């Protein structure tokens, strides 16, 4: 069984901080329930069509450096609404042997 070292990630464009915090809390609860090791977490209030997002790049840097081997989000659209951007992120994870896990 693979031991997942997880970066929990939440994103929303809506200016509703409590909802964003709850989204992250849900991801972290599910990671804990599944027995994953939560290495780090972040949340960002950005549009899902934007690619140049500081929290996203911090998370990808952690993958590249081998600090995490899994990204956990509520759903795929939390990473991006743009299919090309989502593909780029998934290829990046694949290239570094990391996986994407959703709570849904």
Regions found by a protein language model. Give the residues of each.
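Short, structured surface patches at the beginning of a domain
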Residues: 1-104
């Amino acid at each position: 069984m693979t031991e997942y070292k997880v970066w929990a990630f939440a994103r929303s464009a809506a200016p509703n901080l409590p909802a964003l915090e709850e989204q992250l809390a849900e991801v972290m609860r599910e990671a804990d329930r599944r027995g994953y090791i939560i290495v780090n977490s972040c949340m960002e209030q950005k549009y899902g069509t934007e690619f140049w997002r500081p929290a996203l790049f911090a998370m990808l840097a952690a993958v590249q450096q081998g600090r995490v081997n899994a990204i956990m989000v509520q759903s795929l659209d939390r990473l991006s609404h743009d299919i090309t951007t989502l593909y780029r992120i998934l290829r990046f994870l694949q290239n570094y042997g990391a996986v994407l896990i959703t709570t849904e």
